[in-house]
Amino acid sequence: FMKQMKFFLVALMAVVMGMSVTSCMKGESESSYDLGLNATVIDDVMQVCLLGDDGVVYYPNNASVLKGTSGYPERVFVFLKYAEGVTSASTKKEVSIVQGGGLYTRSICLKPDTIKNDLPLVALTEVGVLDATTVNYTSVSAYCNVIFSLYLSNSAAIIDLVPVSAAGNELTVKLQQTIGDDKASNASSGYASFKIPSVSQINSVLASIAAEKGEEATSLIPSGGKIKIKIVATGKNGALTPLNTKEVKVN
């Protein structure tokens, strides 16, 4: 039930953020899909596949329905139907896309000096990470995916994930609403995916932050090729309860 709720929350947030939703439904009387999930699009030379946040690779026979004028989105939410003879127990998950659309996707901010606003959020709900190396896609970026609540009105909203500090292999980042209505009072749920840059890029940002403050720079040092991500945020009455750290393999 919770997975279903999260998925519909994502679909709602995609609409709020102005993203398109593609529909291939055949009819209300038909059981049109078998599962719904969030995934990373892997545009391989041979074929396009989807790496689900469940860690499973899915092979759609109609991936082109997700393609826009500028190519495939990085991250998508999709309803999938298994191909004939394929089940959840099958080794190769061949599917068709029943409905789908792009997710709100950004990179962890590499230019924090350009961010001027930090509008208060309502709550941090959940964080997950996706590491494509577990299924041998070493060139695919890792992502940090966050469920949260924010104050929303009819105006556009932009959410950023901004590096704050590092201690050993733990990176603290702040989830900030950087564009929005500072007078909004309606609480709404949101979901955002953030591409995790390379460790060298992150350390460059941390160095610039320290230099601006006149402090000694701290560096992120992976352990076994992995880092831990800790997400913090600010609400109307101060710091929100941070989410549990998540470990992910990075470049």
Pin down the residues of each PLM region.
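Bacterial Sec-dependent N-terminal signal peptides
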Residues: 2-8, 14-45
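First exposed extracellular module after export/assembly in secreted or surface-exposed proteins
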Residues: 34-251
